[in-house]
């Protein structure tokens, strides 16, 4: 019912009950036939792929998922989102013990980092979660094939298994969910020792005295924070004139100041033009992005974090004629169909935010379409989070984007310095910023900088998804004392006046 209501509000039409019955009867006959052919085959077992596989099985499809890594969860779970959050939390605990415990009357001395134990905790979390997904596959009767798949035809996938065998998996519907890979930089060769990708940065055996991060995006700032908290001198080199270019400008400025207070150094409007790894460390030659005098930056380790690129290598897309754009992204329609009948794509390999949760939503929506249901993902309302301390989270448009539309708008802000819970825990850095259309009060964007912004942002995400106004949020009773009261106060500031400032 909720999906039906949302579809009507958004202007989408639901399929008729006759169409749904026909769709389900087709699936039931295919599933019961005992055929070797699958209803759905997914290439890739990351967030998009494994979620699509489970949902497809739940909808009654005979489903197989092919994953080359040998462990489910993709980049996110194995060498991305999850291990980085484990290290962010561990490094934050160390930093708090050294710098904040005393403020709360907790006296500690000789606080040390056991890097091996820290890495062990991270690895344990990853292992537990990958095994958990395998358990979900068994529970939902998803066939799991470990190996590298490539198209033989639009309905056949040749798989070189990790056991060294070859098998062909057939499917009526093939979903490409192969994710993305690290984007390389010309002249900078990643060896995962001195020059590392995010994968290597998650597994360093020693704390580098000097770490240079190339790229001031989400991943670079998070990994820079991990190593900076436990002793590294961190310098971030960024080609653009600002960090995290997609972030609201006002929030970005405060965020950069916060990181600088923590010791992170920034060289903006700077490009890397040379790399020398002949000595014990690395010497980077840099110059202004527009050209100019060159300087040398020395480091023990260099992290290349210049973005990601769709991973479609070896899939034989050319053989079956799947179209891609100039960035290598697979082109799909609103139902995630490619130009080749029976072949679909989701997640990082298609246009849209390269985020794990976006890929998951793609996966669910795609298989719902296959089942005759309504599936939809609004990429303008996908939340994003930088998991530093403080965290920065946002959903919807930035103030700069709203200005470009020409729509008249209002802005309401509320600082955590005026929030009782934030003051009580002695962690009151940051603010909530809400942007709403002036005429209708409809919320257009919400931006939060706070210790737990990633958790707070979802109230705003729901509001945007259902076209709520700032007054709608302001009139919801929020528990006291909580950090979420800052959202209520910012909403009050947007359409009227806040109480506590």
UniProtKB/Swiss-Prot annotation:
Active site per the UniProt annotation: 480 (proton acceptor)
Domain of life from the UniProt record: Eukaryota
CC cofactor: FAD
Residues bound to NAD(+): 215-222, 238, 272, 307
Catalytic reactions on record: N(6)-[(R)-dihydrolipoyl]-L-lysyl-[protein] + NAD(+) = N(6)-[(R)-lipoyl]-L-lysyl-[protein] + NADH + H(+)
UniProt KW keywords: Disulfide bond, FAD, Flavoprotein, Mitochondrion, NAD, Oxidoreductase, Redox-active center, Transit peptide
Subcellular location: Mitochondrion matrix
Any one Gene Ontology BP term: glycine decarboxylation via glycine cleavage system
Annotated EC: 1.8.1.4
GO molecular function: dihydrolipoyl dehydrogenase (NADH) activity; flavin adenine dinucleotide binding
Keyword Oxidoreductase listed: yes
Disulfide bridge partners, by residue number: 76-81
Gene3D superfamilies attached to this UniProt entry: 3.30.390.30, FAD/NAD(P)-binding domain (3.50.50.60)
Subunit annotation: Homodimer.
Stated name of the protein: Dihydrolipoyl dehydrogenase, mitochondrial
Chain's gene name: LPD
